Structures are given as structure tokens and as C-alpha cells.
Regions:
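An N-terminal, well-structured beta->alpha segment
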Residues: 1-69, 73-74, 150-186
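Short, flexible coil/turn micro-motifs enriched in small/turn-prone residues
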Residues: 3-7, 48, 77, 110, ...
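Helix N-cap and loop-to-helix transition residues
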Residues: 6, 23, 85, 126-127
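Short, glycine-/Ser/Thr-/acidic-enriched flexible segments
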Residues: 10, 57, 107-109, 123-124, ...
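Short, flexible micro-motifs
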Residues: 11-15, 56, 85, 104, ...
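Gly/Ser/Thr-enriched, mixed-charge loops and adjacent short helices
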Residues: 13, 114-243
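Residues at secondary-structure transition points
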Residues: 15-18, 59, 107, 121, ...
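N-terminal small/polar loop signature for handling phosphorylated ligands or for N-terminal nucleophile
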Residues: 36, 43, 49-113, 201-243
């Protein structure tokens, strides 16, 4: 099938022919195009940095390696958050002096899909105008790679989720102590992805009892990620039994 390209990112099935699926070739051209867009938006800046992360899909590590290397080849530094969540990555962009972010995920698509979500310096989706430019640049393949002395670097930031949880708990609008006193109990279906890490950290800090199902990050979803009734039977049973 043809790659899907819109304001929420580029996505497709893994493997096959370029331009028809999400292949290493398509990943390189997409990240190179995004790098060009970033440089044009910051013409007088040096040492530009982006934050990258991925969900729990099996293809995520492979794609992440290509993404980071391509950014570096375009002279852009990378803060690598590793396995993460999209809200955490967006928060990381805002709080690490970054000019953009890239999340490797296909959201609610089946596990044979993966995708690239592009974010601006505010941790938000690109504007319609920038998406049009991104598509144009990725198709024209008109970008200049950096020479040896100007390659970017990679810094691992595996505590980004922890720092994001700290920031959430410090929000003035969140009545943390009141929540702790409620003795709440919840069930969570993490579908073997990044939520398996992030959600328990937040719930524990809020003194919320929780039961996590499908919490093993193994690159395979236990069911389709789209939250339809037929995909929520395990969660419904967990709520009845544990809450």
C-alpha cells in the first residue's frame, strides 16, 4: 500500500518496496526532509537538538537506529529517550531546549505497521504548511548532508518518563494529596507497549492501586490497539475482578 502522509505523521507497513511501505529508504528520506525543515526554521542556530523515542513495536528499535543516524548525518544532535510514550516525548521537547521531536509509533494501527510522528519546538504536531513542505522535501530528495566535522551526536535519556512523572505531580492544578486519600483502584491494558512503564510509575506515586494487563514489552500486541469493544474484553474482565 502507499505510505500514508498527513498532519499526524507518516506511517505504513514494514518491509517491501519503498514508497509503497515504510522501508529504511523511506525513513532516511523522511528524516532528512524533517532535518531540512528544522534547519530552515532555525537558520542562525547551531547545535540543533531533537528528542526521539519509540513505542513497543517489534520494528521500533531498527527504525530508531536509522532515525538517530539520519539526524546525525544532517548535523542534528539527538536526545534518545528510548522506549517512551508520545506525551512524554512532547514534554521532553519542551523541557530540553529542543527544536523538534520524532516519535516512532503507528498509534492504533496493527503491529505490522509503524510510523514517524513529527513535532515542532513546542512539542506539537507540525502546521499544515510545514507538513506540505515536509512531504515536498521527502519526495524531491533535495537536502545536504553534513561533512565529517559537523555530524550530530546522540545522548541517551532513559529517565525521561521519570522526569515527566515528576513534572505531572508538581502541577499546581493536580490535587495530589486528595487523590492519594481516595484509595482508588484501576485496571490498565498496556497492550505490551510504552504505557507498561509509564502508567505504573504515575499511579504508584498517586497511591492508586492498579492491575496492569498485557504489560510485557515483547514487540507483539496481545490484541489490536484500536480501543473498540472487541479489543477491550480483557480489560473489562480485569475491572470486574480487581475493582
Amino acid at each position: 500500500m502507499t505510505l500514508i502522509k498527513n498532519i499526524s505523521g507518516f506511517r505504513g507497513t514494514i518491509g517491501g518496496n519503498s514508497l509503497e511501505n515504510l522501508t529504511p529508504v523511506d525513513i532516511v528520506t523522511s528524516i532528512s526532509a524533517f532535518s531540512r525543515l528544522i534547519k530552515e526554521s532555525n537558520p542562525n542556530s547551531s547545535g540543533l537538538t531533537v528528542v526521539t523515542g519509540r513505542d513497543g513495536r517489534k520494528s521500533g528499535k531498527m527504525i530508531h537506529s536509522i532515525v538517530n543516524s539520519t539526524f546525525n548525518s544532517m548535523g542534528i544532535n539527538v536526545i534518545d529517550a528510548g522506549l517512551s510514550t508520545t506525551p512524554t516525548l512532547c514534554w521532553g521537547v519542551l523541557n530540553n531546549d529542543s527544536v523538534g521531536g520524532l516519535m516512532i509509533t503507528a498509534s492504533h494501527n496493527p503491529e505490522e505497521y509503524n510510523g514517524l510522528k513529527f513535532f515542532n519546538s513546542d512539542g506539537e504536531f507540525l502546521s499544515k504548511e510545514d507538513v506540505f513542505k515536509l512531504i515536498e522535501y521527502s519526495e524531491s530528495k533535495n537536502y545536504v548532508f553534513s561533512s565529517n566535522g559537523y555530524l550530530g551526536s546522540i545522548r541517551k535519556y532513559e529517565k525521561l518518563i521519570d522526569d515527566h512523572v515528576d513534572a505531572i505531580l508538581n502541577l499546581k492544578i493536580l490535587p495530589v494529596n486528595e487523590i492519594k486519600d481516595l484509595n482508588l483502584s484501576v485496571s490498565v491494558d498496556a497492550i505490551n507497549s510504552g504505557g507498561s512503564i509509564a502508567i505504573p510509575k504515575l499511579l504508584y506515586r498517586l497511591n492508586v492501586k492498579y492491575n496492569i494487563i498485557n504489560s510485557e514489552i515483547k514487540g507483539v500486541f496481545n490484541h489490536m490497539p484500536e480501543p473498540l469493544a472487541e479489543n477491550l474484553t480483557d480489560l473489562s474482565k480485569s475491572i470486574q475482578v480487581n475493582n
